[in-house]
Amino acid sequence: MTTSGRPLIVGEVLFDVMPDGIRVLGGAPLNVGWHLQAFGLRPLVITRVGPDDAADEVFGAMEEWGMDTSGVQRDEIYPTGRVQVELQDGEPTFDILADQAYDHLDARRAIHSMAGGTFSLLYHGSLISRGDVSSSALARIKHQLDSPVFVDVNLRDPWWHHDEVVESVQSARWAKLNQRELELLAGSGDVPGVEGFRREHDLEAVILTRGDRGALIADSGGTIEKVPPEGVEVIDTVGAGDAFSAVFILGLMHAWPTQQTLERALDFAAAVCTITGATVTDRAFYAKFAEQGWW
């Protein structure tokens, strides 16, 4: 797959609210779009924010990074997405709040923002389908776009239902998930389970992320596994999976071989683990990857 079209990103933009009140901008779709912008792919992010100061922060951050904000809708009632982070015995727990602005995507406005654009693929996660309004909007966008879909499975209790997630996978060409998610959906988290999952849902490729054990990609040519690079000083792993997804998309856009895509995605995800948070505003962070001819 080699194309000059733009990636279309649909999903949640939200703030992680830490126990000390600090807000960190994120959401998997925004994180992926953020990296794709740095890669020069000019993604269009379709999301929805609220009538609040947090929304102003979203617009400000995206505009400063040079991102197209024409797909960002502003709701008059529901707040900008928020996840409340608490610490229990030193371990973080996440309360993904209900009825946020991103749960109320306006399909008509989304399609209007796509007018005149050429889109190479559609990326979305599974959280955006937790409510009927945004789930319906996503379905209409898919129908309008008729482009291949990359679904990033993120099973966050209690915000997912087995049949709905399976339906989103079946409408995709590529799917990414972790070992626990594969076990929940397929009953097995091993290599045969990945291959069976790909065949069952007629996917071109399945990406299985395995934390410090690396990742694997299963496609029609078989399964390729790789461990992460050694000697990485991990600060936190927030956003590592989103970094992987972004490089996988970059590889699709430039028709990289599967082995190269896997190696580069792991390298970039490891680099993101050396910073605090899922994204970085220093373009020098991306320079070494550009110098290696990634884009």
Outline where the language-model segments fall.
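Substrate-binding N-lobe of the ribokinase-like
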Residues: 6-7, 18-83, 87-91, 98-102, ...
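Short, well-ordered alpha-helices that flank and scaffold nucleotide-derived cofactor binding pockets
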Residues: 34, 38, 60, 143, ...
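Conserved phosphate-binding/catalytic region of the ribokinase-like
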Residues: 1-6, 191-295
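Short polar catalytic/cofactor-binding loops
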Residues: 11-16
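Short secondary-structure capping/turn micro-motifs that flank functional sites
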Residues: 52-53, 78-79, 158, 183, ...
